[in-house]
Every structure is written in C-alpha cells, then in structure tokens.
C-alpha cells in the first residue's frame, strides 16, 4: 500500500515536472517570438535624419552629405547631385556658378542672385546655391525642370521623394486596411499601415505580393489581393533615334577659301549622312560659315537624296589654332558663345546634326574639351539634333591623340567617330600604311574595353586614299604624296606586282624610280571590305569615309 502511494506520488511529480518544463519551453518560445517581433517592428515615428527616395529606391545610405533644409528650402550637396543626377556637374570658377546638364537641359545657378538660367533663358528662383562647411549645396526644387523630376517632402516621415517623369509609374488602390511589411516573410517589420481606399505606387507585383510605396514615402510589401485597380499612370519615355540603322556617313571636305562642291548629278547609294565642311572657327574664336548659294544647293541635293546633314565644325586642325582653341575651352563664357553660334546655324539651315572635328589641341585642355561637349549636347538634344565627335586613335602624341577623353566623349555624344587612318601620316618620317587592319582593330578594342564605349555609338572612319612614299637608297623618306583610291591604278605601273599582306589586310607594292624606291600600301575595295567586317563583328554604329 505504501509503495503504491509512493509510486502514485512519484508519477504525479513527474507529470508536474513535465508540465512545468513544457510551460517553461512555451514561455521561452513566447519570449523569443515577442522579442523577435519587437525587434522586427518599426515604430512609426519621425526619423532623425531626412531619407531620400529616388524612383522607388531608398538611397539614404548612399548620401555623401545629409540633406539640408533651411527656411523651407531643400538642398542637396553637389556631390549627391553628381551621384544621383549629373555625374558631370561642374563648378565654374570664372562665373562663380554651378553648371549642371541633364538630357535636354543645361542650367546655371549662382551663389548670390536668385536666378537660374536654363538653355539660355533666365528665370527667377526662391533661393540660390550656398556654400556651407566647405560643401556646396544646391536647392533641388529649382532643378525640377532641368532633371525632369517631381519632388515631394513628407515632413511627418522626413522622406524626400523624387520621381523621374520619364519613367513608368503604376498606381493602385488599397482594398482593405493592411500593414506594409519590410519583406515577404510571415514575421517581418511593419514599415507602414494603410487604410482602405488609399492610393499607392506599385513598384512590382508578382508571386502573390506587391512591392509598394505609400503616400508618405514608405516602401514595403503587401499581399497582391489587398490592392485593386492597378493602372499605368505614366509610361517610360525614350528618345527616338534619328537613324535606326547603321550610319553610313561621307565627309565632304572643301577648303575655307573654296565654294561648296556641286553634287547635283552625284549618286550616293547607301549613304545616309553627309558631312560638308560648312563651319570653321576663326582666330578670334568665332564661328565662320562657308555655305553661300552653292552650299544652299548642296543642302537641297542632300535632302532630295534622303540624306541627313551633319556638317563639320572645325578648328582648322593646324597648330596655329591651338592657342585660340585653348582660350575657348578655358572659358565657360567663350564655350557658351560658341555653343549658341552652333545652335543658331543648326536652326538657320535646318540641319540634322553636326560633326565636331577639333584637332591639334593641348593635352592639358582635354577635360575642358569634354566640358564643351557636355555643355553642347543638351542644346542639340533639345532640338532633336545629333552630335557626333571625331577622335583619333587612342595612342599617340599629346596634341594628336592624348588631347581627347574618349570615355567621356563616347558617353556624352550620340556618336564618337574613330578616324582610323593616318597610322603613318603627313608628319611621319617612316614609310607605312595609312590604315592597317591590325592597327584599326587594336584601336577599336581600346575604344570598347579600355574606354568602355558602347559599340553602337562608335562609327569607324576609313580612308578612301593612301600615300605614295619615296625613299632614297638609305631608306630615308624623301617625299610622300596623297593618292585617292580612284587614282591608284593610274599611279602604279601596270607591271608592278601587288603582294597581299594578311596582317594589314591590304596589297603592298614596291618599285624603283631611278635611284629611289616607291612604296605604297593600297586601299582598295578588298582592304575596305576587311575593315568593314569589323563593324559587324564588333556591332559598331556605322561607317564614315574620308577622301582627300
């Protein structure tokens, strides 16, 4: 009897201990869950600093400086504007202004006057740029029209919300009171609460969950079934390309003292762009026209042949213009004057674009030439015009090659034209090819890999000429003559053997001329076909041809 009672007591104690252990386990789980929930739940109060939401992304952590709010105006630092909107934003010391460009707009805003100039037109502002603690701040609301953005500041959440007006935006209506979660997990932070009937921005909607942005700028997830009436409130806006196929451009050069060529009866099958040498910079930095009645007839001929017209704007390309070009590039005022002149002639003659052909520049002016292109590009885009820029091969002398920042030019301009000729040119003391295949391909690879230029923006410029080199018995170059492709057969004696060079992908000839030796690396249809193959192989934007 006693043993039975003890056994019953022992069993009862075991059950109690088990119940106690179970209660302890449940309590521990409950504490852990509550702790997790408490940790995962965000109190919907004010933030200590202002958040920045751009196109439905919270980029606050990427801010270089805190957002500044003074007297009701919101300022972003120059560094942050550069990070989020205009990587080429620029402080001009000469005029004491901030210069910023974006798409079709270029704007100037100073540090004293409440004025902003956009594409040459002034308008009043509520404030101006400021310099505080060695940081330049610019009022973001004054740049709405420049960056094409919508700005909303929600004081209750300290969220600065910026939307690009050229990007798609979808909206929906909340169908039931809901909590917005930080993730799609069952237990997740609550970032906001929304009521039935509230309008939200739909960022994505898939697999039963919608990522949304609330009216006060909070971003999170809600079950898809809790939103209705999803509509596209704004479509993506993309600028149409003037030429959708490959560019086939022909430079049509004539000197400053000559008249435009008469092309009345000229057939140009396959060519879709012509670039006559209509414009030059004089020694004072002014844009000079060389069009006249012959040029007007040329324009009419080009249009009748369905050709776009991108005339050259040249700085003459000789060393005498180096100082003038440098003075223009080193002054924002002079750059702006030249840009206005270019825009005016584009409007006057109803041009489709221009081709910048600046050569023989100082290496130290490289960045300023890029600035000129950065500042010109939005004015061209405003009118729907194409900006193409000629550059030489990546390796070479300071004034011939190293004066170009090909990466920036390729990024900003519609097209960058690689003048893949004069490998051995007028200044060469050694005989050689005008445009060897291996040299051209090496240059292209540098454009694509080192300079990181989009292949579709690169136009390959090829020569329709070569040179006849004359050497003495010691190999010294005595003279060199430019020979047009159409005159090559009449220049080389008929009994001279043409040898194919598979590295250069062209024929080579060498023959005696008395005690001297003539050499020529021939440009013909076969050598051109080899180079044209690079356009399709590397998916380039097209072809440009130069004839001397």
Regions found by a protein language model. Give the residues of each.
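Active-site groove signature of glycoside hydrolases
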Residues: 275, 337-368, 415-430, 544
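Short, acidic/polar
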Residues: 253-269, 332-348, 398-407, 522-536
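SH3/SH3-like beta-barrel fold
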Residues: 197, 209-214, 222
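Substrate-binding surface in catalytic domains of secreted glycosidases
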Residues: 283-293, 340, 366-491
